[in-house]
Amino acid sequence: VPPRTPIQRGLSRRTLLAAAGLGTAALGLSACASGPGSGVTAIRFFQTKPEVVGYFDEIIARFHEAQSAIRVVHDSTSQIAPMFVRGNPPDLALLNYDLEVARYIPRGVFSDLSDMPEAQRIQPSVQALVDQYATYEDTTSVLPYSIAAEGVIYNKALFEQNGVAVPTTWSELLAACDTFTAAGVTPIYSTFKEPWTIRQGLFDYSVGGAIDVDAFFTDLAAEGSDISETSGTSFQKNLADPIDKMVQLARFSNPDAGSRGYSDGNLAFAQGTAAMLLQGPWAFGEIAKTAPDLDLGVFPLPMTEDPADLKARVNLDLAAWIPEASKNQEAARVFLSYLMSPEIIDAYNADNLGFGVTTDAPAATDPKITALQPLIDAGAFYQGAGTYIPNTIPVMNYLQATVRSGDGASLLQTLDADWRRIAVRS
């Protein structure tokens, strides 16, 4: 692991806050010694989520109206890897947090944010999501900003018309699918043409609803290259039951699932052709373009016979980090504090169907997602199994073949072999 580079300072935080008219009390930042330089400090803000680029442009404009010491340049088009390769990372990033971002943490290239008051406001169960992928010494390299919680989107009218209650056990889920099938309603609209939808939905929900995902991958890593059907932990040993159930659920899909993609699924679901859709909250806006008044809800996919086992799939839809190589860390911290002020972060999550990450965050109020709030509050959530699998393993292609063939055993054998191969080379 390379040593951490010293912080390169431009204007001090005290100078920036004073010039910005955003006092330390307002932003909760302590002062520090002054550094060289004066005038306006420009920082590059890396945020590429396409549906909220305009949203953050508006936030940046409001920040500029409130002060004149810091100018934020919104970079929404770059790629993370080339920036680090060229030694030109942004001053502040607010991105989806996944395994590809997490691989930078052990290298010590993100600055430690643990001394920021905002870090103390993060729910411990949410901050733990960061550590599940990677850690670096005793530091806080990434601050969560927004959680996207996912489950089964369902058409409330179709459930009511067919006398189906929201299932809370595996047997109830199967019974619901049988009822819809008998009534001529497609139980689950699937979009197997785009394999990411299989990984995010059927695979992640099936596995996450049945096992402790993080514990499984922790134990799998401990096995090293000694992974097989008979080892203490393996895909074949631990995932056999959830994958068998995944294959069962796939059979309740629309007959043309293999030729239908994400957009097709949103349109068909909006037209009322299916009762359930295994997608995240990002699908709501697309569905609303066709059926703005469609009454929808969401529930966690039940994979056991105990309702107490219900969990939501989550991902850190946005998380913040400041590179050590930034020459404007103090200014970046000021803007990050602004972004994490309750009036900004809470409004963002409310407007974008996200769940809050702070101890004082208000509960979600949109009726489409409120059913997941108790699970978020209780920490009954998991990051999808597919997100732990490196890109060097083409799991999405494997899953696409599995839902077509129904051969879950071959999938698990292949995953064990691929994982073993990577472990040998590591």
Predicted features by range, described:
Residues 2-103, 107, 118-120, 258, ...:
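Conserved N-terminal structural module of periplasmic/extracytoplasmic solute-binding proteins
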Residues 110-115, 266, 271, 281-289, ...:
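Mature extracytoplasmic/periplasmic domains
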Residues 75-82, 170-174, 257-270:
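Short helix-initiation/N-cap motifs at beta->coil->alpha
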Residues 220-257:
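Glycine-centered hinge/linker elements that transmit conformational signals in sensory
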Residues 2-3, 160, 378-426:
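Conserved C-terminal helix/tail region of periplasmic/extracytoplasmic solute-binding proteins
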Residues 98-150, 174, 201:
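Hinge/lid segment of periplasmic solute-binding proteins
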Residues 141-143, 174-228:
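Extracytoplasmic/periplasmic solute-binding protein
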Residues 296-320:
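Periplasmic-binding protein-like
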